């Protein structure tokens, strides 16, 4: 019998990014990764890996001017990356709106006056400018396929955001409400003060991005605690009892809410509350229990981790418990001297076999085709990873480098 690979949880983080050479600003590179904190040093030659087209010393160092984050799968990020790299070949940029915003593309779509047949497209030139890439990004985010995805554009360079803003003010079509723009990095001096949560707040620089499941700890802990004893729980929509072992159950992420629902019940309720009849998956909705707005992707990320990686989910909670105890002990120790014999037991215990390392979610990432030999040596001396959560960064052979 054919064995099927067990489905993996939704990745904690995946993004597409636009690199720019700090030496020559006209040199640009588009890529994708589950870990931009690690990826940027690779492009700059500080760590092994990176891409062949960013390996020239005369163009280093590179900077990440912006990231498009919020992808719920590696496949989705790769689709977006390819379309951004090859706008002239992407079916997502063939809509009438996109043709209106690109006069040359609109002219190419006209029929030949003599034969009546559509004119053949001339061989596309490489799109070289920063403005061109931002135009394509804007069009992709407005496209039918990507406009309902929970994506965020995070700008780290103020001059790049100014170019984006100039184009955004010129184009007639606006970004969907689902797409968020976050001012970060150099933009913080002029960015409005914000206390946004769920990854919408500025972080200052690439190294401060939250790329693991830490932000899901409280939600995951509450869900697993409640669903371990579901006898008194019922669906907030249909009011029937729930059975976590047999049904897909979602839990409201808000801290003080105990709302639990059948997956299909809540998705139907959220979809019925919208005016978009073509929408198959909800983007957000109002929790029937607490009345707060809930992002659908937040619940799906927690549900997939709880159902598809229960062992690892419990290890995450053990790590949180140990961290909290250690922090509490440190706070007590700062005011009252403590001997080693009075340390909490959890601090003296050796980690269990099930405990996860700090980078467990990325242990199987493949960085680049330029580091195949190094990876093979590394794998020969390291035990296999316990869970393949995300896979490799993208490094297309024909990835676009603009010079």
From Swiss-Prot:
Record GO biological process: double-strand break repair via homologous recombination
Domain GIY-YIG: 12-94
Ranges of Basic residues composition bias in the record: 116-126
Zinc fingers (SLX1-type) by residue: 235-290
Keyword Protein biosynthesis: no
Cofactor: a divalent metal cation
Bias type Acidic residues, positions: 362-371, 390-403
Keyword list, A-Z: DNA damage, DNA recombination, DNA repair, Endonuclease, Hydrolase, Metal-binding, Nuclease, Nucleus, Zinc, Zinc-finger
Quaternary assembly: Forms a heterodimer with slx4.
Family from the record: Belongs to the SLX1 family.
Annotated function: Catalytic subunit of the slx1-slx4 structure-specific endonuclease that resolves DNA secondary structures generated during DNA repair and recombination. Has endonuclease activity towards branched DNA substrates, introducing single-strand cuts in duplex DNA close to junctions with ss-DNA.
HAMAP family (UniProt xref): Endonuc_su_Slx1
Name of the molecule in the record: Structure-specific endonuclease subunit slx1
Lineage: Eukaryota, Fungi, Dikarya, Ascomycota, Pezizomycotina
């Amino acid at each position: 019998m054919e064995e099927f690979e067990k489905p993996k949880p939704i990745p904690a983080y995946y993004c597409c990014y636009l690199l720019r050479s700090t030496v020559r600003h006209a040199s640009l590179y588009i890529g994708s990764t589950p870990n931009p904190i690690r990826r940027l040093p690779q492009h700059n030659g500080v760590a092994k890996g990176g891409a062949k087209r960013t390996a020239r010393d005369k163009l280093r160092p590179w900077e990440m001017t912006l990231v498009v984050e919020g992808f719920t799968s590696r496949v989705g990020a790769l689709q977006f990356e390819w379309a951004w790299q090859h706008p002239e070949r992407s079916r997502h940029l063939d809509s009438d709106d996109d043709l209106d915003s690109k006069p040359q593309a609109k002219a190419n779509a006209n029929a030949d006056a003599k034969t009546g047949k559509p004119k053949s497209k001339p061989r596309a030139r490489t799109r070289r400018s920063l403005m061109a890439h931002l135009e394509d990004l804007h069009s992709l985010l407005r496209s039918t396929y990507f406009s309902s995805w929970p994506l965020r554009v995070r700008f780290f360079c103020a001059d790049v955001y100014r170019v984006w803003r100039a184009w955004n003010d010129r184009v007639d079509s606006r970004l969907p409400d689902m797409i968020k723009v976050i001012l970060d990095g150099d933009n913080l001096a002029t960015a409005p003060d914000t206390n946004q949560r769920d990854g919408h707040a500025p972080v200052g620089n690439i190294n401060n991005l939250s790329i693991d499941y830490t932000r899901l700890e409280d939600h995951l802990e509450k869900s697993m605690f409640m669903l371990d004893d579901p006898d008194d729980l019922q669906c907030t929509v249909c009011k029937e009892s729930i059975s976590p072992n047999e049904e897909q159950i979602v839990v409201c992420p808000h801290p003080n809410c105990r709302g639990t629902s059948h997956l299909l019940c809540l998705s139907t309720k959220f979809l019925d509350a919208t005016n978009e009849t073509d929408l198959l998956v909800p983007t957000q909705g109002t929790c029937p229990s607490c009345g707060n707005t809930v992002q659908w992707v937040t619940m799906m990320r927690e549900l997939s981790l709880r159902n598809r990686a229960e062992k690892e989910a419990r290890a995450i909670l053990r790590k949180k418990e140990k961290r909290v105890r250690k922090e509490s002990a440190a706070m007590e120790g700062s005011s009252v001297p403590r001997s080693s014999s009075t340390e909490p037991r959890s601090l003296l215990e050796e980690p269990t076999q099930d405990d996860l390392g700090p980078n467990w979610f990325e242990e199987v990432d493949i960085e680049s085709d330029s580091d195949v030999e190094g990876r093979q040596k590394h794998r020969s001396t390291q035990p296999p990873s316990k869970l393949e959560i995300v896979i490799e960064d993208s490094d297309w052979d024909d990835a676009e480098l603009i010079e």
